[in-house]
């Protein structure tokens, strides 16, 4: 799915929004953070992912990583989710993502990707996005397509976020 790193996207997935579609996975995700810190989950996770305490880092990384793994497919893939629990993967995945998020993707402005889309306006391309992508809402692909009209927008009708879903694989390869 298309990710623009806009504030509303981060809030949708990591603060409130997707939580209403996956309350079971959400409950597991937020257990890593005390209730008094849940008003800003990305920052709360950042403090734990950069903690000096290895157990604290790992618990936060697993919660973060499993949250995304559990929401990436239209139909939850248990093997995919369990792969997100592996310590080495979880630590790398969560720390890299969170680092970019707390730093605004190192963009000059929030909507930099859309703002700079005219730079590739003359280049043909294909935008593939799962209709039921909860991680990166389809509005991102729609906005990019409007800003990049030479790109073909292919919405896979029975897919979520993962590039490993059959329809997404077919559209990408």
Question: What are the functions of these language-model segments?
Answer:
Residues 99-117:
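Active-site nucleophile elbow and catalytic-triad environment of alpha/beta-hydrolase enzymes
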């Amino acid at each position: 799915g298309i990710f623009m790193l806009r504030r509303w996207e981060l809030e949708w997935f990591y603060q409130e929004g997707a939580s209403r579609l996956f309350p079971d996975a959400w409950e597991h995700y937020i257990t890593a953070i005390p209730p008094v810190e849940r008003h800003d989950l990305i920052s709360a996770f950042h403090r734990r992912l950069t903690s000096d305490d290895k157990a604290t880092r790992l618990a936060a990384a697993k919660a973060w990583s499993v949250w995304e793994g559990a929401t990436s497919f239209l139909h939850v893939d248990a093997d995919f989710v369990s792969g997100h629990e592996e310590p080495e993967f979880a630590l790398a995945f969560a720390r890299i993502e969170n680092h970019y998020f707390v730093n605004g993707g190192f963009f000059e402005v929030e909507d930099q990707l859309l703002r700079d889309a005219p730079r590739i306006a003359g280049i043909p391309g294909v935008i593939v996005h799962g209709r039921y992508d909860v991680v990166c809402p389809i509005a991102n692909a729609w906005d990019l397509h409007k800003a990049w009209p030479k790109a073909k927008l292919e919405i896979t009708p029975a897919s979520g976020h993962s590039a490993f879903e059959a329809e997404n694989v077919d559209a990408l390869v």
